[in-house]
Amino acid sequence: MNITDIYETMEYSPAPESPDLALEWLKDRKAKFGLFINGKWYKAKSGKVFGTNNPATSEKLASISVAGKSDVDSAVSAAKKAFPGWKALSGHERARYLYALARQLQKHARLFAVLETLDNGKTIRETRDIDIPLVIRHFYHHAGWAQLLDSEFPEHTAIGPVGQIIPWNFPLLMLSWKVAPALAAGNTVVLKPAEFTSLTALLFAEICEQIGLPPGVFNVVTG
């Protein structure tokens, strides 16, 4: 008996979380995702897509748009256009958006955890019990800093649109490390998730829509 035979004959305990919630989310979107630019979803101008797969099974999860130079330029233009208005908001007003993001992340924590596991291959215990709770805490934490920024750092100045590239090993957690402080400080964002682990960034873009984040403040280009 070889290793493959052993794996095929082993008895496995029930999974601590069902993938059904994430699979239903993918099905509702026909497992096809565009680019999130200026608060709306667009197909890549080239029409190109690539597949993202479950690393545990090699099963295709979704088709994702491949952004080209003109798509990235559009996202940067949207971030530049949104910057003056976002910067002009008081820290308290920006904090309300960050707090709303934290609440939505908390509300959909199970979906984020299961989707991250399917797309990245981490164990559900790591995504559910470590990564996603930390993501939520980062947004709550930086909502607090946004509110205190004017009094604690009265000379601070927002930089402007920032480009953020996310690695595959901590897809949503690294997003929170970069996006939360950038938005709290009055910057706008163009985010590029890792090719292999884009799905939770796209789900995050959806919740940005749901809370009414101003168009162009947060943009996602995939590829």
Language-model segments: what does each one mean?
Residues 41, 83-86, 145, 168, ...:
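Signature tryptophan residues that serve as conserved aromatic anchors
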Residues 22, 33, 60, 82, ...:
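Glycine-rich, flexible loop/turn motifs
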Residues 45, 72, 109, 128, ...:
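Alpha-helix N-cap/helix-start motif
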Residues 59-149:
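Glycine-rich loop-to-alpha-helix module at the N-terminal edge of alpha/beta enzyme cores
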Residues 37, 51-54, 60-74, 212-216, ...:
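Histidine- and aromatic-rich ligand-binding microenvironments
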Residues 148-223:
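Rossmann-like NAD(P) dinucleotide-binding subdomain of oxidoreductase/dehydrogenase enzymes
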Residues 1-64, 96, 100, 133, ...:
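Terminal low-complexity tails and localization/encapsulation signals of metabolic enzymes
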